[in-house]
Amino acid sequence: MTLTTKHFDVEIPSIGFGTWQLKGDTATEAVKTALETGYRHIDTAQAYENEKAVGDGIQAAGSAREDFFLTTKVWTDQFKDGDLQSSTKESLKRLGVNEVDLLLLHWPNDDVPMEETIGALNDARKQGMTKNIGVSNFTKDQFDKAVELSDAPILVNQVEYHPFIDQTKLLAEAGHKGSALTAYCPLAQGRVFKNETIKMIAERYGVTPAQIVLRWFVQQPGVVAIPRSSNPEHIRQNFAIDEIHLDGDEMARISALRMHHDRIVDPDFAPVWDNPLAA
């Protein structure tokens, strides 16, 4: 069964397959395994330099195009009007598809006016390159501005989100605007496996810490998670969470870990992040 969250009449599979840092044959085999396992949401990006490999994995799995949700992201050096559309066409060629389901701006870029970039993103949608549009790594204020500037709904804000980071503000704002929040690094690059709270809950259910955390995500309204793995067994385990049902206390105990506010992805070009403690 594919768990989904619905936004602006669009059904987004709640567990997707992330492909960051997967390259070449490894990416191809991982995507093939994911689709054969039952994943119906694949996430890639121009900057990952694996769109061709991801497309090969899609083809190898033999999945009908209408049966899965495909996301890619435009890199910041392609944010000018014209550049964005041209680069998206190249992405489609590499992926071997006529359109993606979701096209995201990968990071905010203050060097190009947001009005221009959001306009170009909407134009790519009007030209049939993507069904939906969204953003990634946008702060609350940047997200609000993107929503205000866009003709089409901003379906998603994709951000770092795991049990050890406080994204309460972005979650609330996405919900207020009707958008989804997609979590990358949902397993905190393996840190969830070492946490005693998560390990204890996993032992109670007889499942992995990863499965517990992914279930924690899908039980939050409007949240999507995109775990990544090149290990076939882990790919299959991460998808097998239908039979897990966390109670309110377990959800709260995992959510309380956000007090650590431990951010993993913070490059030099990142925006000034929202302060979870500020009013």
Region spans (language model):
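Beta/alpha (TIM)-barrel catalytic core signal, keyed to glycine-rich beta->alpha loops juxtaposed to Asp/Glu
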Residues: 108-279
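Acidic-and-aromatic substrate-binding clefts and catalytic sites of carbohydrate-active enzymes
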Residues: 23-25, 45-53, 77-82, 110-113, ...
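N-terminal binding-site loop/beta-alpha segment at the start of enzyme catalytic domains
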Residues: 1-68, 277-279
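Residues at the N-termini of beta-strands
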Residues: 41, 99-102, 132, 156
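CE4/NodB-like, metal-dependent polysaccharide N-deacetylase domain
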Residues: 84-104, 123-127, 149
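A short, structured active-site edge motif that brings together acidic residues
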Residues: 65-79, 99-108, 137, 161
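Alpha-helical scaffolding within the catalytic cores
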Residues: 1-5, 52-59, 87-90, 140-143, ...
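Short, acidic/polar
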Residues: 23-35, 80-95, 116, 143-144, ...
